[in-house]
């Protein structure tokens, strides 16, 4: 039997909607990255974009285990002398743009390169319950039910 290599015209893309409420951030990011890359499909081909579209809602209710909300920090530099800035994961989650927390976690779980950048564009993250993608008839994926460790109660 020969090795199958998918062609871009043969790829059937689905839409998934994932509710992030109470789900552990890292476990959620792994599942999203696999869906975006198409690793859940039998026709997965490393050099072809076989991934699906993923819509994540309730990004502000994602769960961080341990003391990561207070202790883990994102750093950036303004470019000016002494311009190092930082923000904790809890501040980002509770701030104006909680979707950036999930976006950054998924981005760091994908390979770096032009194909991964194209796959990453199929991720849409929303802080609240509403999303404008009902016309695509997305399939609801219950990440919390896949594994008991995916969801934390407190």
From Swiss-Prot:
Pfam families: Ribosomal_L13. One of its GO terms (biological process) is translation. Keywords: Ribonucleoprotein, Ribosomal protein. CDD domains: Ribosomal_L13. Gene3D superfamilies: Ribosomal protein L13. GO terms for cellular component: cytosolic large ribosomal subunit. It comes from the Bacteria. GO terms for molecular function: mRNA binding; structural constituent of ribosome. Part of the 50S ribosomal subunit. Belongs to the universal ribosomal protein uL13 family. NCBIfam families: rplM_bact. PANTHER family: LARGE RIBOSOMAL SUBUNIT PROTEIN UL13M, RIBOSOMAL PROTEIN L13. This protein is one of the early assembly proteins of the 50S ribosomal subunit, although it is not seen to bind rRNA by itself. It is important during the early stages of 50S assembly. This is Large ribosomal subunit protein uL13.
């Amino acid at each position: 039997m020969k090795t199958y290599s998918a062609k871009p015209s043969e790829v059937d893309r689905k839409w998934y909607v994932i509710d992030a409420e109470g789900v552990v951030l890292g476990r959620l990011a792994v599942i999203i990255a696999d869906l975006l890359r198409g690793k859940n499909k039998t026709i997965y081909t490393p050099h072809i974009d076989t991934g699906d579209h993923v819509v994540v809602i309730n990004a502000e209710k994602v769960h961080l285990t341990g003391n990561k909300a207070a202790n883990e920090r994102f750093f950036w530099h303004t470019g000016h002398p002494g311009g190092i800035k930082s923000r904790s994961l809890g501040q980002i989650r509770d701030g104006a743009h909680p979707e950036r927390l999930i976006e950054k976690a998924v981005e760091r779980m994908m390979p770096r390169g032009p194909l991964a950048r194209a796959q990453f564009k199929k991720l849409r993250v929303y802080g609240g319950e509403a999303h404008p993608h009902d016309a695509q008839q997305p399939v609801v994926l219950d990440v919390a039910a896949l594994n008991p460790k995916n969801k934390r109660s407190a």
